[in-house]
Curated annotation (Swiss-Prot):
Listed GO biological process terms: defense response to fungus; NAD catabolic process; positive regulation of programmed cell death; signal transduction
Name of the encoding gene: RUN1
Enzyme class: hydrolase
Membrane-crossing residue ranges in chain numbering: none
Amino acids binding NAD(+): R34, G35, E36, D37, T38, R39, G66
UniProt lineage: Eukaryota, Viridiplantae, Streptophyta, Embryophyta, Tracheophyta
Organism annotation: Vitis rotundifolia (Muscadine grape)
Keywords per UniProt: Cytoplasm, Hydrolase, Leucine-rich repeat, NAD, Nucleus, Plant defense, Repeat
EC number(s) from the headed UniProt entry: 3.2.2.6, 3.2.2.-
Full protein name: Disease resistance protein RUN1
Length: 1331
């Protein structure tokens, strides 16, 4: 434990005397040591061991310089209960250490506040040398001068006194054993009020902080906090750590452990005695005559004191009745923690706050397991996959991780594999016994619900489960709540979840009496057990639920008679490999056929003869995917059936017997291709949902369908032969959803369909319907009407305007030409889609009356203009007129749409915009791309204060008005392919939010000086601008592909990188530098560590983490794409996994680089690519630096948009280099300055036009990235990125003929610059847009 909390003064208004306030104790141990001797070996290991025992230890990790000891160290010594002094060879050479020692011994001898213990450790030194200041200690004192004559006597006295104390002389032997002995001894001597929370307290700090926060230690009120969770999750351990953490703040404390067990075996009296004894500290205890007398004593004594009490493992309210009935029993300022598996106990107790303890995350679980299985904090490499299997099996349960870790310690890989196979069938007894306690406390019905969930319902919707269990008379609502309160299940998004180990416990309970006779079990869930049960001579008589996955059947099952004896069967689920959903529209017809074939192939494994029978009179739920017979069994009795699911079955006609099916709520026969007709529906009056999707042979629906007064959903989607519905459909007074989509022969909606007063959704998309009856207007509850892709639908009914509740009307891709005036009466309409209605020419004049309309999609229509009334659409947010090639003029009153946020005019015939466009105060995105006639952006366009995105790509625009600078919220400005665009206004520098400026393929020649004022600007694209003469240096990204500028790009790169390396630590943390270099000659020799293939591992330099001149690593990989990858312009996604490890610790991170650059497509002779990453040291947690000794880099690559990693991308070679600043340690070849002036020269020009030579800056920075980039031979043009200065340079400014600089600053030895270079922000979401 390393967490601390501030002290709190205790007070009580009801106490007869105010309790004394002890000195503030923040740490258990202050660790004094000589850093250069032991910091990274013995002391570090000792510090970690103390932490694992829950001993709060202060260690000064700073490399301090100076004469006086820091005040925070003196304070830390005073606030520590003890000190551990590591006397090493050079300890006395540090005046700082000696001052610490003097302070420590003063605290040790302080009579006013005794108790500061001192534990000396003599690390490879003779204790007598310390005591007498001889040997290295004598030599140290001999070197001190007269100026220290006042301190030397105190130093000597402190050394002598400390050396006279009992300690540990360490000379030879295993340090791990010695450290264990020391930590155990310190723990025993410090424990006092402290409890042993155990070793290896991984992941506990966050729980402790959460609980302490909930205790509100600063408050003077009484607070009770409940902590609940499944058994073995660590509640008791957390409570002990909190108890130890807060022990210094309370004079009166008690920890009552394992109350449930003690209460059940001994009663409450011993617990009352222990509580009083703890509070009174063994003094003045009185005999308790009865439980009631004990309760009275507790109330009288506690009410006058400020106490801290932990009541551990309470599982029933009766256990609190006579221990702590009410908060009024406690003095003000008291704190109580109650741990339990039963959340209901906490609700009844009315605690102030609740905290649910969740399992460890994967990394924490892996560490905890490794500490027990390998006695280190990560798995051994050979055991990594097996370890991950165990960690996955335990699902973050600390108890299971500890038990299995101990079980597998020092076992071989074959032994591990054997144990894991055993665990699949037989849970470890110690884990099982802990988890089973919660089950043992359940009632009979709750136990049945629990086993049903474990064996059948896990992961299902709560409402569905409740409905089925209620039909079994199990009182599901209260039962599920109790299981949730007792942490046996959890509810997430209304689904019932269960920990895998708890589920396995449920399975074990079912198997308990007859472990090897599955035919006698009450529930079957495993395919192998089902196969064994079918072969049993006496059949399966006791089974209540069967859940069977057909894909896991190893052989064909043909014992049809086995079902005949299942007289208790309540729940039957025979499913395919997946719960296949044929509905998503992205699944094409061929794939749906393939999915159907998968179901039928699996279904064929269960062969049923024509004489198949089973007594179904107890059956509540039946699901059988691919049911193989034409009819249900002749003796089928569905009298208690609630849901019937026969997807993909061979059923031709559904016959459910002669009984009334009053309990039946759901029938799903979807994709039963042979189903041609349904029997009468009169016998199922309470049916609520009927699914007949994909029943391609179904011709009609029986007229009795109108008798189902409670039917809410009727899905007939993709019933290809269905032509119409009976008029009785209008009698479905409760119907809410009617789905007829993709019924390709359905031509006419019934006239009486308007009687369905509850209908809210009507889906007719992709049908043969031509029109709708006027009665459609009577659907007063209809909210959603979809007629999209009805190619024959020509006219929307006049009375359609009566649908007052309609919110969405989808008429996309229909033959509709116009809309009736009554459309204005759709007062609730929010979304109107008319896109791809190629005959639609005119929006109704009175359409502006639709005050609720928020989205209007008119793209790809024949519309020419919009009426002025469009401005009256006060709620409109989205207007799309894209690809309306005849649309020429935006209405003047369009500026009245005050809510409009997105306006798409892409590829229209529009020439200009009215000035009123500036009145669109809410507009966020304006798209005018591909408007080839658009020439002038309106002067008042600068009034759109909310505009973030402006697309002017491929327009005829020549310039922008000065008012563009007033777009203070604009973040993206796209002008690419506007070939006439020549100049940006000077006021563009006022756009303080601009992040991206795309000027590709324009006629622009230069940028205004104000471009340097755009601080947020991160990307500038200037590729293929043949007239461009100036490059700025104020950006994070520049795309200069195919520019004709003869800039010295190497010099530019050096300036960019120098500025970047000079940036703050915070900036290093936020940015990741990477480069993509096509047409490369390979990884240069100065990258020290290289290896063939995609992975490289090397040892780190000694003390790498302490060197202030070491900023990070260069990681590089040489790729060779295949012909396939070079033929297509996919986005290349390069990744590097970085792994630092050593001393049993590991750190992993990932670098990535995505590039749309298509340079590689055009390279004919060589296509090798190099990806380079610059990884800063500051990205590695500083407190862990010293732990790592090796670095490993692993490289991968794929094409973005492809679902697979490309195996044909070869990783030829990779490398790592450790880089330094300010010296010559790397000795890497750097770029040289060009020897010629003129066009090959370079200079800098600042914002005022002053020219600076290339030797202007003489700061000594060693730029390894430039060396790396400059040593690749490249033939392409350039992409430059990451510049931080606000300067620009001209191509025609030359350098002096002779410029001599230090060799570590020389730049430009190669005649051709790099081809692509990019600086990536780790959080940038649209890095690819400008490509």
């Amino acid at each position: 434990m390393a967490s601390t909390s501030s002290s709190r003064a205790s007070s009580s208004s009801s106490s007869s005397s105010t309790p004394s306030i002890p000195r503030t104790i923040t740490y258990d141990v202050f660790l004094s040591f000589r850093g250069e001797d032991t910091r990274f070996n013995f002391t570090d290991h000792l510090y970690s061991a103390l932490g694992r025992r829950g001993i709060r230890t202060f260690r000064d990790d700073k490399l301090r310089r100076g004469e006086a000891i820091a005040p925070e160290l003196l304070k830390a010594i005073e606030e520590s209960r003890s000190s551990v002094i590591v006397f090493s060879e050079n300890y006395a050479r540090s005046r700082w250490c000696l001052d610490e020692l003097v302070k420590i011994m003063e605290c040790h001898k302080d009579k006013k506040d005794p108790g500061h213990a001192v534990f000396p450790i003599f690390y490879h030194v003779d204790p007598s040398h310390v005591r007498k200041q001889e040997g290295s200690f004598g030599e140290a004192f001999a070197g001190y001068g007269e100026n220290l004559k006042d301190k030397i006597p105190r130093w000597r006295t402190a050394l002598t006194e400390a050396a006279n104390l009992s300690g540990w002389p360490l000379q030879d032997g295993y340090e791990s054993n010695q450290i264990k002995e020391i930590t155990d001894s310190i723990f025993r001597r410090l424990k006092c009020k402290r409890l042993d929370a155990g070793a290896n307290l991984v992941g506990i700090d966050s729980h402790v902080k959460e609980m302490i926060w909930r205790l509100h230690m600063e408050s003077s009120d009484v607070r009770m906090v409940g902590m609940y969770g499944v058994g073995g999750i660590g509640k008791t351990t957390i409570a002990k750590v909190i108890y130890n953490e807060l022990s210094r703040e309370f004079e009166y404390m008690s920890f009552l452990e394992n109350i449930r067990e003690k209460f059940n075996t001994q009663g409450v009296s011993p617990l009352q005695n222990q509580l009083l004894d703890d509070i009174l500290k063994g003094e003045g205890s009185q005999n308790i005559n009865s439980v009631a007398h004990g309760a009275s004593m507790i109330k009288d004594i506690l009410s006058s004191k400020i106490v801290f009490i932990v009541l551990d493992d309470v599982d029933d309210q009766s256990q609190l009745e006579y221990l702590l009935r009410h908060r009024e029993w406690l003095g003000e300022g008291s704190r109580v923690i109650i741990t339990t598996r039963n959340k209901h106990v906490l609700d009844v107790q009315k605690v102030d706050d609740l905290y649910e303890v969740k399992g460890l995350n994967f990394e924490e679980a892996c560490e905890l397991f490794s500490l027990y299985a390998f006695e280190q904090n990560l798995p051994k490499s050979d055991y990594r996959n097996l370890s991950h299997r165990v960690v996955g099996y335990c699902q973050g349960l600390p108890l299971a991780l500890k038990v299995l870790g101990c079980l597998l310690l020092k076992k071989t890989i074959p032994e591990w594999e054997s144990e894991l196979r055993k665990l699949d069938r037989e849970p470890e007894a110690e884990i099982l016994s802990v988890l089973k306690r919660s089950y043992d406390g359940l009632g009979r019905t709750e136990k049945s619900i629990f086993l049903d969930v474990a064996c059948f319902f896990k992961g299902e919707d709560r409402d569905f489960v409740s409905k089925i269990l209620d039909a079994c008379d199990f009182h599901a609502e209260i039962g599920i709540k109790n299981l949730n309160d007792k942490c046996l299940i959890t509810l997430q998004y209304n689904r019932i979840r269960m920990h895998d180990l708890i589920q396995q416990m449920g399975w074990e309970i079912v198997r308990e009496k007859f472990p090897d006779e599955p035919n006698k079990w009450s529930r079957l869930w495993d395919t192998c057990d089902f196969e064994r049960a079918l072969t049993a001579y006496k059949g399966i008589k006791r089974v209540e639920t069967i859940s069977l996955d057909l894909s896991k059947l190893k052989r064909v099952c043909s014992n049809s008679n086995a079902f005949a004896k299942m007289t208790r069967l309540r729940l039957l689920k025979v499913q395919s490999s997946l719960d296949i959903d044929f509905e998503p529209e992205y699944i094409d017809a061929d794939d749906k056929v393939e999915l159907y074939d998968v179901v039928m192939k699996n279904a064929s494994k269960m062969r049923l003869g024509r004489g198949f029978k089973f007594p179904s009179y107890e059956l509540r739920y039946l699901r059988w995917d691919g049911y193989p017979l034409d009819f249900l069994p002749s003796n089928f009795d569905g009298g208690k059936l609630v849901e019937l699911h026969l997807k993909c079955s061979n059923i031709k006609q559904l016959r459910l017997g002669n009984k009334d099916l009053e309990m039946l709520k759901v029938i799903d026969l979807s994709y039963s291709r042979k189903l041609s007709q349904m029997s009468e529906f009169s016998s199922m009056p309470n049916l609520e949902r009927l699914f007949l999707r994909g029943c391609v042979s179904l011709i009609d629906i029986h007229p009795s369908v109108g008798n189902m007064k409670k039917l809410t959903t009727l899905s007939l989607k993709s019933c290809k032969k269905l032509k119409n519905l009976p008029d009785s459909i209008g009698d479905l007074e409760s119907l809410e959803i009617l789905d007829l989509a993709y019924c390709s022969k359905f031509e006419k909606f019934p006239e009486k369909g308007g009687n369905m007063k509850s209908l809210t959704e009507l889906d007719l998309q992709n049908t043969a319907i031509k029109d709708l009856p006027d009665s459609i207007g009577d659907l007063e509850s209809l909210k959603y009407l979809d007629l999209s892709d009805c190619s024959k639908f020509e006219k929307f009914p006049e009375k359609g305007g009566n649908m007052k509740s309609l919110r969405e009307l989808d008429l996309r891709n229909t033959a509709i030409k116009d809309l009736p005036d009554s459309i204005r009466d759709l007062e609730s309409l929010e979304r109107l889609y008319l896109s791809y209605c190629s005959k639609f020419e005119k929006f109704p004049e009175k359409g502006g009356n639709m005050k609720s309309l928020m989205e209007l999609d008119l793209q790809n229509t024949a519309i020419k203009d919009l009426p002025d009334s469009i401005g009256d659409l006060e709620s409109l947010k989205y207007l799309d007129l894209s690809n309306c090639s005849k649309f020429e003029k935006f209405p003047e009153k369009g500026g009245n749409m005050k809510s409009l946020t997105e306006l798409f005019l892409e590829n229209t015939a529009i020439k200009d915009l009215p000035d009123s466009i500036g009145d669109l105060e809410s507009l966020v995105s304006l798209n005018l791309s591909d408007c080839s006639k658009f020439e002038k952006f309106p002067e008042k366009g600068g009034n759109m204060k909310s505009l973030n995105w402006l697309y002017l790509n491929n327009t005829a625009i020549k310039d922008l008005p000065d008012s563009i600078g007033d777009l203070e919220s604009l973040m993206r400005l796209y002008l690419s392919n506007s070939s006439k665009f020549e100049k940006l206004p000077e006021k563009v520098g006022n756009m303080k939010s601009l992040e991206l400026l795309d000027l590709r393929n324009t006629a622009i020649k230069d940028l205004p000086d104000s471009i340097g004022d755009l601080e947020p600007l991160e990307k500038l694209s200037l590729s293929n601008c043949p007239k461009f003469e100036v490059l700025p240096l104020s950006l994070k990204a520049i795309d200069a592909h195919l520019c004709t500028s003869k800039e010295d790009l190497s010099r530019l790169l050096w300036l960019c990188h120098r500025n970047w390396l000079k940036s703050t630590t915070e900036e290093f943390d936020r940015w990741q530098l990477s480069a993509f270099i096509p047409e490369s000659s390979g990884i240069p020799e100065w990258i020290t560590y290289q290896n063939l293939g995609s992975e490289v591992t090397e040892k780190l330099p000694i003390n790498w983490c302490e060197d202030p001149d070491f900023p990070g690593f260069v990681l590089s990989c040489l790729y060779r794409p295949s012909d396939y990858s070079s033929a297509y312009n996919f986005c290349h996604d390069f990744k590097c996994e970085l792994n630092l490890h050593g001393n049993g610790f590991t750190f992993t991170d990932e670098c990535s680089h995505s590039c749309w650059c298509d340079c590689h497509v055009n390279f004919k002779d060589s296509r090798d690519l190099v990806c380079v990453y610059w990884y800063p040291k500051t990205a590695i947690p500083e407190e862990d630096h010293h732990k790592y000794t090796h670095i490993n880099a692993s490289f991968t690559h794929r094409f973005e948009g492809h679902p697979f990693f490309c195996e044909d991308i070869k990783k030829i070679k990779c490398g790592i280099n450790v880089i330094f600043l300010g010296d010559q340690r790397n000795h890497m070849p750097m770029l040289e300055h060009p020897q010629n002036s003129g066009d090959n020269g370079s200079a800098l020009q600042d914002a005022n036009g002053n020219v600076h030579g290339a030797n202007q800056d003489d700061e000594h920075y060693h730029i390894p990235t430039l060396g790396l980039l400059g040593n690749f031979h490249d033939n392409g043009s350039a992409v430059l990125e990451d510049t931080l200065g606000n300067r620009k340079r001209r191509r025609d400014d030359s350098l002096p003929d002779v410029v001599e600089e230090p060799h570590y600053k020389k730049i430009g030895s190669h005649p051709t610059p790099i081809s692509c270079f990019e600086l990536h922000h780790q959080y940038q979401s649209e890095q690819n847009h400008m490509w």
